[in-house]
Amino acid sequence: MFPRLIVWLLAASAVHAVLDISNIKPKRDYENFLQKYAEYADDEVDRSVGSDITLSLKEKFVNQYLMDLKTEELKAGLKNPSQFIPSNHFFSVLDRINSSEIFKIIRRMPKGAILHAHDTALCSTDYVVSITYRDHLWQCADPKTGALQFRFSKESPKNTDTCQWTPVSEERKNQGEEQYNSKLRSQLSLYNTDPINRSRDVDSIWNDFMGLFGVNFGLLTYAPVWKDYYKQFLKEMMEDGVQYLELRGTLPPLYDLDGKIYNEEQVVEIYYNVTEEFKKENSTFIGAKFIYAPVRFVNATGIKTLTTTVKQLHERFPDFLAGFDLVGQEDKGGPLIGFSRELLELPESINFFFHSGETNWNGMTDDNLIAAVTLGTKRIGHGYALFKHPRVLKQVKKDKIAIEVCPISNQVLRLVADMRNHPGSILLANKKYPMVISSDDPSFWEATPLSHDFYMAFMGLASYHQDLRMLKQLAINSLEYSSMTLEEKTNAMKLWEAEWEKFIKELETEVFSLLE
């Protein structure tokens, strides 16, 4: 017995010794550290958005120039942090962005698609001001707030205690053109010279934000203007290097001078006809689709009305209607789970593109993210609170649910102050998470259709190491995660690639001339 015990103890000791040896940590070694550090750094670069792109020789040349400019801006920011553009409020640095060489390159760059933008917050403020020079336009001002309302009419609309109508042409003449237009501009966008101290919390900025839609309403819902406004945005979008659009809209009733009221189907028909007309006029324009996106402030009866409407639109415009969404401040509006029964009754051919997680709250409003993925949303609007939901994150990656990141919107609406702290930076660091960059309501912050958001993504959200490959991948993503069919995507990529090659060739020539 004892010999066996001794043998067993010796064997156990030997095994224990082997285990002890295997658990011995290597001594600290500088060369080993450098090797590990390089492995980690390379691995992080390999995981980031854009790492799958292989650049051509021409692209590499352009990329070197772009990265020299990026390095220069980043080093200047490191030296003087208060002057680093993405760490400041967009309104405070808009002029500096516009003069940035990086922005000028991004502005010219073919960026693919805008997948998140709203119907009456699209065009430049200059264009909206130009609309007020049209005939038959009347205005009134709220006696308490001074908020303007507009209406096109052959005769004066009916006056009320809070609304005394006068012709816009007379008001402009009486006040002086420059003064009138300056006051008007202040009610057409949130842009101001003291953005930090004005509207300091989420609710107050949202109140100001929603007020803009009220000023725009009577001005833009005049049927001839509605058509022109949409076509103008397609022009501005193309000038900004964007070839495709998926537009969210509430479909308000339109009117004309003869008293005709246009219903939802007629409004979508205007969108469709203008899109087809613009396609014929512009060979590089890929197209557009429409997402019906009414406000979320409805009861049980209201949501049934909305789902009935989207079914009718889907039957009438099966190829043009991309799907359905609910919009408005998530913190105040009804949660998705409250509408889930009615939403699940919609046919599966109607896709969802839900706004969700556009909030700083945790375990409250942001639970819309859980509802969105379990309802089968194809994309997530904003998804700012996404990283508070690990299960949702897992599903987003598995089902390739693209996150529509809108950096400037998130800053202006008080979710983030410094773009370097935007959670979208984590998405850019991990290519497994599908994402696109979009602009939300560019008109209301006097931004370009997409370029300003791309600039903030490149300089604020992205790593120092992320380069032209990231920008190219984001453009590709915008087409890949669109609601186009496979055939449409194939044709879209051909049109985009042709523009990309043209952009690279032109920029290469210009850089060569600078170096000579």
Curated annotation (Swiss-Prot):
Keywords: Hydrolase, Metal-binding, Secreted, Signal. One of its GO terms (biological process) is adenosine catabolic process. CDD domains: ADGF. Salivary gland (at protein level). Its EC number is 3.5.4.4. Pfam families: A_deaminase (PF00962), A_deaminase_N (PF08451). The keyword Secreted applies. Residues 1-20 form the signal peptide. It comes from the Eukaryota. It catalyses: adenosine + H2O + H(+) = inosine + NH4(+). It is found in: Secreted. Its cofactor is Zn(2+). GO terms for cellular component: extracellular space. InterPro entries: A_deaminase_dom, A_deaminase_N, ADGF, Ado/ade_deaminase, Metal_Hydrolase. One of its GO terms (molecular function) is metal ion binding. Belongs to the metallo-dependent hydrolases superfamily. Adenosine and AMP deaminases family. ADGF subfamily. This is Adenosine deaminase. It comes from Phlebotomus duboscqi.
